[in-house]
A protein has these predicted regions:
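Glycine-rich phosphate-binding loops of nucleotide-dependent enzymes
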Residues: 2-526
């Protein structure tokens, strides 16, 4: 007699118009097991799990819970079958306590404040969450908010938990704590599904790995019988080199210097406190920190988008007689002050600065425009005369489609119709094509599949070797440690340390992300 699976998907198909997101997928989820769900962007991972959690209905196929066919039309139906999903973007009311958020929408005396707090405490003690039921959400760290989301689905009786990119904004220490909690739930007989791009986490945590490719089910393997290389080949269908290079540029001239920078947000609260560092052409300077530590504000201040209360940002242009071919003249010592200048004024004084913001469509691109018009946003003011050059940006758009493998019906298709990963490729490609001397990019591979991610790493290294100063805000510490020459760590809007990329460890950077002080500040260079 075959074992009964907690959840079994049979021949599941889901279409959105002419696009087949899931094509006849079969998948089994078992109790007491952690299953990682892998696949490139657009492979259908989240769509498949959204059908389990009641957000979508399958067009074809059936879902079995404990061997019996079920219909899941809503998240309420999903909970009735013991299925709970923790999404990447948390759905909590900031002014409510943990207990109030967990009980939100539930009726009856058994869900009054005192009863909920007691049950939340019991769940917390059982799995080691360490949650305070009476703590307000706005006082919580990112990992605490995630904990509340997990407890919320457990409180509603979930036996099958689905987590979408659960470690995206966690420190290494918080990630290990989450893994210990998931292992405890697995030991208690829960079935757990993890959607992730991080292969090292797949290998460290999961029992089995299921792989999707272009909406089709490729197979499920035991984690102990595979490795990152094999999993990557299953995802993309061909061999892929997973090495991240760290080439060394011949020259490293001072390109950017930040001194005592202080900034406030729109509510008048300090977001950057006495920030000082240097960035050099021919290096990649990583910027690490938990979410909300000031990464976004720092890049925006340098770009002229965030007003500075005090401090200085000096730009040092390459010597005009230097060239990529190898002729090098040391940088002029007189720096150009950027504080107080708008982005337009920064451009007018000759600062060649490219910025890939975190908010792609809100700040970086115009969603209603096609690729050609979005390319022109960077250059249309440079065209002399009344007529705007469209041939050059069209040629650039076609070149980027080819080089970055951007999936789009055409260069005139509004970019908002593209997948998130393809939108990122458009923005990164445009900024790199502007031949900057300073390239700032925030989370350039967020949402990208592994093939596209390694393409972006290669492009960043190419800019570095052209003596561009690259500032890279990232969330994957493994990548930052492999790719960056130095890593600046922010904590609470302050520089908690600047470490050497080749010699630093995840644990060292993780501690600096949560503690100000103890790191090596300043700009000591060999």
């Amino acid at each position: 007699m075959e074992p009964v699976h907690a959840i079994e998907l049979r021949h599941i198909t889901k279409r959105f118009g002419k696009v087949v997101a899931n094509d006849g997928i079969d998948l089994a989820i078992n109790r007491g097991e952690i299953l990682s769900l892998l696949g490139e962007n657009g492979s259908g991972k989240t769509t498949l799990m959204n059908m389990l959690s009641g957000i979508y209905l399958p067009d074809e196929g059936e879902i079995l819970a404990d061997g019996k066919p079920v219909t899941i039309r809503s998240p309420k139906d999903a909970f009735a079958h013991g299925i709970g999903m923790i999404h990447q973007h948390y759905k909590l009311v900031e002014v409510f306590t943990a207990a109030e958020n967990i009980a939100l929408g539930l009726k009856g005396k058994e869900h009054d404040r005192k009863a909920v707090a007691a049950q939340v405490q019991a769940i917390s003690d059982k799995y080691g969450f360490g949650i305070d039921p009476n703590k307000k959400v706005y006082d919580m760290s990112v990992s605490e908010k995630q904990t509340v989301e997990i407890v919320k689905v457990l409180y509603r009786g979930a036996e099958i938990l689905i987590l979408d990119e659960p470690t995206a904004v966690l420190t290494p220490q918080e990630t290990e704590r989450l893994f210990n909690i998931l292992r405890a739930m697995k030991a208690d007989g829960k079935a757990i599904v993890i959607i992730t791009h991080k292969l090292h986490e797949v290998m460290a945590l999961s029992d089995k790995v299921a792989v999707l490719r272009k909406g089709k089910y490729i197979g499920t393997v035991n984690t102990c019988d595979t490795n990152p290389q094999k999993l990557t080949e299953m995802m993309v269908g061909h061999a892929v080199t997973l090495n991240i290079d760290r080439p060394q540029a011949k020259y490293k001239d001072l390109r950017l210097e930040v001194k005592g920078l202080n900034c406030r947000n729109g509510e008048g609260l300090p977001v950057l406190k006495d920030i000082s560092f240097q960035a050099f052409g021919g290096e990649i300077l990583g910027i690490a920190g938990i979410a909300g530590s000031g990464q976004k504000e720092l890049l925006e201040a340098i770009a002229g988008l965030q007003k500075a209360d005090s401090g200085h940002i000096f730009y040092y242009p390459p010597h005009p007689e230097s060239d990529i071919a190898g002729h090098h003249v040391p940088v002029d010592k007189a720096g150009e002050e950027l504080v107080g200048k708008t982005p337009g004024q920064i451009r007018k004084v000759g600062v060649s600065l490219a910025f890939v913001p975190e908010d792609r469509l809100g700040m970086g691109l115009v969603g209603g425009m096609g690729m050609v018009d979005n390319m022109m946003l960077k250059t249309y003011k440079d065209t002399p005369g009344p007529l705007v050059d469209r041939k050059t940006p069209k040629a650039l758009a076609e070149k980027l489609i080819d080089e970055l493998e951007i999936v789009t019906p055409g260069v005139a298709t509004p970019v908002r119709r593209l997948s998130g990963g393809n939108v990122q490729k458009v923005l990164v490609g445009r900024e790199i094509a502007s031949t900057p001397t300073v390239l700032m990019t925030a989370y350039p591979v967020r949402g990208l599949d592994i093939n596209s991610s390694y393409t972006i790493y290669r492009l960043l290294n190419e800019q570095k070797m052209k003596e561009v100063a690259v500032l890279l805000v990232g969330e994957d510490l493994d990548v930052l440690l492999e790719l960056c020459d130095r890593i600046l760590v922010l904590c609470g809007g302050q520089v908690s340390g600047i470490v050497d990329g080749p010699t630093a460890t995840k644990e060292q950077v993780g501690l600096l992300m949560t503690h100000v002080g103890g790191g090596k500040e300043g700009e000591d260079r060999a």
